[in-house]
């Protein structure tokens, strides 16, 4: 013991420096006193000694917990002070702003990092875990390690590429994989953030979907999207599912394979004879050609009757003839339409002249028949008609209606309407003289000639204007002259109407002068007196022929006055037309000279 103590010396603890007690004034030198029981190598092994390792550990833990408790108390005090400050500020602001701030504060914990979270340490830990996983997979494939030497260099290069591809993808703070250039071509040569923090990108407004398709293995779309090239392709793992979900497989599973299907039973003949069952190979079920009926109810054994063949041929011939007739008729109609479309104005005038001739013939026939019926009718029928007329019709009213009718006929402009009116007037007065009728015919022929000359003159003018190139100035002059002509024509028409009105007024005055004047205002008494006079006259002249002569003479005088008026009017019209024709010829000649 002593030798050991002297040779080795006393082992001092960390609290002693150079064999002196730092805490007290006494300096004890254990080397001088050897062989004592105060050796630290012995005392440190005791559990009750403060310098023992477990006691030192407990002390350190107690110190750390105490320091952490103090730190936590400080943080709580700081938070409390902040909260009190917030409440003071909130008391000063409005109610709406206070509610907004309170709601924001209620949700603010979602955006605060969890206490004790270090992103760098977490990232490093994840990287280590991935490394361990990769090493485990390489150690688990010993066959691959054995065959490495036997592979060529190209295969080794391919393995290196696969290892490069299997590099761990960079992830964000929450452990989600970030899109890289390898997966998305859009991100090639994209600008990077200077801070080095991985951020979410949307280059050129292209949405980068950080998802992987399970069918094709590409990034940017999922298995059900349209972008996937294998959208409609049936994968091998889906074939089993489709077969399992197919209802036909379930039906086949429920049915017995030995039993025939319904459509097969329908095709095969039945076994029971009452249900139409038969054996198709049976000789009594064979169809013979002799038993087949033809269309006409006979058998096909004999030849077809000749009468049927004849009837069929005649029917066909009739049909063909009908078709030919129809075709001929249609071709004729087409030719006629072509001719009518290509026909000139001369052909139209010819047709119009033919129609006029027909109308003249008809009017002559009507006139002859009316005159015959008028002459052949007896005196009794004349008396009856005269009595009816005197009963129902007022003579003054009849005169007024005749005058009104004549005025209307003069106002009508159309040429054919005027002709028709003249024919009516001729028929209405059968006792007109032959001289008057000759005069009317000559007058109408003159009017026709003047109209034909006028039309031909207009046609020549149109042809000349279409052939000769006219300058813009001459065209303007022509338009101005045509406007003047129209004004002159309007003035002439107005003069004609005024002349007609004056003539009608003069006629009415003459008639009123011829009528017997009376001072009685009562119209009924006047009508009675007129009727009495007519009766008296008729009774005095018992002979109806004398009465008819008297009637004819009165009519003749009226017709003479009308014919004189018409002749005056026609002369006026002819003179105006001649003046217009001369003025047009003069203008036409002046235009030709200018051109």
From Swiss-Prot:
<feature type="compositionally biased region" description="Basic residues">
    <location>
        <begin position="584"/>
        <end position="595"/>
    </location>
</feature>
<protein>
    <recommendedName>
        <fullName>Uncharacterized zinc finger CCHC domain-containing protein At4g19190</fullName>
    </recommendedName>
</protein>
<feature type="compositionally biased region" description="Basic and acidic residues">
    <location>
        <begin position="470"/>
        <end position="539"/>
    </location>
</feature>
<dbReference type="Pfam" id="PF10197">
    <property type="entry name" value="Cir_N"/>
</dbReference>
<keyword id="KW-0479">Metal-binding</keyword>
<feature type="region of interest" description="Disordered">
    <location>
        <begin position="254"/>
        <end position="290"/>
    </location>
</feature>
<feature type="compositionally biased region" description="Basic and acidic residues">
    <location>
        <begin position="256"/>
        <end position="267"/>
    </location>
</feature>
<dbReference type="GO" id="GO:0008270">
    <property type="term" value="F:zinc ion binding"/>
</dbReference>
<keyword id="KW-0863">Zinc-finger</keyword>
<feature type="region of interest" description="Disordered">
    <location>
        <begin position="310"/>
        <end position="595"/>
    </location>
</feature>
<feature type="compositionally biased region" description="Basic and acidic residues">
    <location>
        <begin position="161"/>
        <end position="174"/>
    </location>
</feature>
<feature type="compositionally biased region" description="Basic and acidic residues">
    <location>
        <begin position="120"/>
        <end position="133"/>
    </location>
</feature>
<dbReference type="InterPro" id="IPR041670">
    <property type="entry name" value="Znf-CCHC_6"/>
</dbReference>
<feature type="compositionally biased region" description="Basic and acidic residues">
    <location>
        <begin position="414"/>
        <end position="428"/>
    </location>
</feature>
<keyword id="KW-0862">Zinc</keyword>
<feature type="compositionally biased region" description="Basic and acidic residues">
    <location>
        <begin position="547"/>
        <end position="565"/>
    </location>
</feature>
<feature type="compositionally biased region" description="Basic residues">
    <location>
        <begin position="316"/>
        <end position="331"/>
    </location>
</feature>
<dbReference type="Pfam" id="PF15288">
    <property type="entry name" value="zf-CCHC_6"/>
</dbReference>
<feature type="zinc finger region" description="CCHC-type; degenerate">
    <location>
        <begin position="211"/>
        <end position="228"/>
    </location>
</feature>
<feature type="compositionally biased region" description="Basic residues">
    <location>
        <begin position="351"/>
        <end position="364"/>
    </location>
</feature>
<dbReference type="GO" id="GO:0003714">
    <property type="term" value="F:transcription corepressor activity"/>
</dbReference>
<dbReference type="InterPro" id="IPR040014">
    <property type="entry name" value="CIR1"/>
</dbReference>
<dbReference type="InterPro" id="IPR019339">
    <property type="entry name" value="CIR_N_dom"/>
</dbReference>
<feature type="region of interest" description="Disordered">
    <location>
        <begin position="112"/>
        <end position="180"/>
    </location>
</feature>
